[in-house]
Amino acid sequence: MSRKKKSRKPGAAGAPEFVVTRNRTESDVEGRLRKRAKKRKGLKTGSRNSEVNEQKKQSSEQNRDPRLGSKKKIPLIVEPVKKMTKQERRLSAEQELEMLENDAQLNVLLDRIEAGENLGTGLQKYVDEKLDRIEKLMDQLGLLEPEEEEDFTASSAKGSRNDDDLLADFDDINFDDYKG
């Protein structure tokens, strides 16, 4: 019968729940593996020559003088910057408008606003800036229809009702309809 070793893990002395038993052969195998790992700590054999070649390549790159600079040619005459034509600016404005209209984040935020959700100040500011930019681009491209001004005369007529009319409306209200 082979010898059984008890583990040194702490536990209840009376009831050993986690007793690890090891055979002699398992311990021998583990010991051999540890010894083999200890023996092979150093570098690979025969790697001396290849390391020297690699170091020579690296040292030649490191010895390069940084003061020599680049061999890239630099133009001595400054060419004037070409201004965008009206047609190119119009195209870029159309592209920007298309990008803003297809902006996924802006569409999600607008959907949230339509649903009655209140956005934070940062998100609301973002939405306002984007909508203002869309309005400017549409105006620039001639796509924006001028807003029709509402007739303020009709609203001012309602607002100019005198106190007697308002009091008469209040007296005519039937409060029995609102009782639950």
From Swiss-Prot:
Interacts with Der. Residues 33-43 have a biased composition (Basic residues). This is Der GTPase-activating protein YihI. A GTPase-activating protein (GAP) that modifies Der/EngA GTPase function. May play a role in ribosome biogenesis. InterPro entries: YihI. It comes from Vibrio parahaemolyticus serotype O3:K6 (strain RIMD 2210633). Residues 1-87, 142-180 are annotated as: Disordered. Keywords: GTPase activation, Ribosome biogenesis. Belongs to the YihI family.
